[in-house]
Amino acid sequence: MAETYNGIKKTVGKALSAKKVWYFLQSVDAPIGSPALLPAYQTEGGVTYGGENVDEQTKMGRIIIKSTDEQAIDLTQYFVPGDESIEVVKDAKKTGKSVKVWRVIVDESVAEDVTDAEYKLYPAEFGYGMPDEPEISDGDELVEASYTLNIIGSLQDGKFPLTDEDIAAIEALYDYQNPGETTGDYSDIQTTPPAQ
């Protein structure tokens, strides 16, 4: 057998910060044209690319063949009253319906510009997930919600559109303001005077 040298390939770059991976949800009953929901105060997220293999011994040796996909997305967040995403998950668990879920890498190094569009495209995975044991934990600190979305079939690769304004709004709780421009706490900023 002839010796062949094909070299090596090395990836160089900055490691991806977990803060640049965002998860979005949507009810399967949401009308066409509805926005995706960003679960409030996500603290952790993760994807499991599991599955089963058929593993058999034969007279000719071992055979291993892929059998099933068992993918899941786990999310943990702090509970905020009025957060629609938690209601979507709880309702889906009650009704037996799935939830649409996107895992999006929101990093400028992987963004794709779109000609004549105000948004960029970011690498994403999409799937329909069945909620498994949504849990709301009322401890001594902040109320925490966690749940697993077991993916039906397997996650599909695609591109998720986001504008710079979307990203800025998600990354910051509020924008810069001058004195007297607004009233209200950071969670209830008002730009018009209250009616008297």
Segments the model singles out, each with a brief description of its role:
Residues 88-90, 143, 160-164:
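Surface-exposed beta-strand edges and their flanking turn/coil or helix-capping segments
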Residues 161-196:
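Intrinsically disordered, low-complexity terminal/linker regions enriched in Pro/Ser/Gly
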Residues 41-42, 106-157:
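Short beta-strand and beta-hairpin "edge-sheet" elements
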Residues 58-123:
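Structured, beta-strand-rich domain cores
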Residues 84, 156-159:
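Intrinsically disordered, low-complexity acidic/polar segments
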Residues 13-16, 115, 193:
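N-terminal cationic amphipathic segment used for targeting or macromolecule association
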Residues 2-76, 128-143:
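Solvent-exposed edge beta-strands and adjacent loop segments
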Residues 99-103, 153-157, 173-176:
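Glycine-rich loops and low-complexity Gly/Arg-rich segments
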